[in-house]
């Protein structure tokens, strides 16, 4: 961990892996020497984890559930990586994690709104903060942390830009709540990506800090052009914030945030998630997590843009185009129904409307062949028919 993890992992991945080591690996395998660890040991370990109580990160809602198969798979990935490193360092000759049998895991498909459901959500939303967040997610394919970390100095919504269709946002940072110990460890290694640490407004001590930090990957730093509706909503919010600043004067805590409380303090992901739950409860729309709006946005852009994957990838900030097609090309039943109708009209009905040459029966075929091979007989038959007429 000290040699590899702190030199390669970001704060979130580091925190999650430290949590898995502390609560899932050390209690059950901590007394086993690496050289003595076998594939059978790991098989038994993963099987037993299914009956162990899950341990949630600090600040997360407690649960009575047992360790999920998703967590087991991630724990295995961590162990496999660590044991690969042990092979490289020549502590062991082979990696015992390579041939383990994991409990079967079927990833749960995330619910994603259709275009009509997303439009209904926007039309029904009366909370200005949630509506602005939804517009940025659907219009710009932004992650929730990128939306909450967006600052006005990265927004171009001048009248000229809106008229010319060049209004845009520059995504250069994200807002995130991180474990203090992970942040401190990365800081000591000179790998901190924190740009700003927000004050702690709660009096009680916390193990986490709310920060503005650089995005997770280089490709996440990007420029996204704004649909006019989104640009106008941002302009309206900027005017509203200016009025509040003048009203509160020194009482406004100005962090230059686009999405902010009435006194300037930042919103957090859990607060936006709560607002979204209230909206789905009130409207009867399918309950979704906020990140699924980004899925919805990417799918809409793929459809509207005729499958222009590179353009969509530029908006989503994914490092690889495969991630856009694999994760975000969400196809719903209505689209599949329309596709079936199009196959019917463009293929089967056209085939039915095309005149088909009827096959000849055996007697007719023999007569036809006889006339072709004996043109004199054919002329005689024609002359006879003409006389009868």
Q: What would you call each of these model-derived segments?
A:
Residues 87-96, 156-163, 177-183, 234-249:
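Proline-centered turn/helix-capping motifs that create local helix->coil transitions or kinks
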Residues 70, 88, 135, 139, ...:
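C-terminal catalytic core of tyrosine-transesterase DNA break-rejoin enzymes
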Residues 55-58, 63-69, 73-75, 88, ...:
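Basic, Lys/Arg- and aromatic-enriched nucleic-acid-binding interface segment
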Residues 104, 112, 163, 173-177, ...:
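Catalytic-site neighborhood detector that most strongly recognizes the C-terminal catalytic loop/helix
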Residues 157-168, 173-221, 230, 263, ...:
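C-terminal secondary-structure termini that scaffold catalytic or DNA-interacting sites
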Residues 1-43, 237, 241-254, 333, ...:
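N-terminal DNA-binding module of tyrosine recombinases/phage integrases
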Residues 68, 195-211, 215-285:
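Active-site/catalytic core of tyrosine-dependent DNA strand-transfer enzymes
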Residues 2-89, 107, 265-271, 286-292, ...:
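N-terminal core-binding DNA-recognition domain of tyrosine site-specific recombinases/integrases
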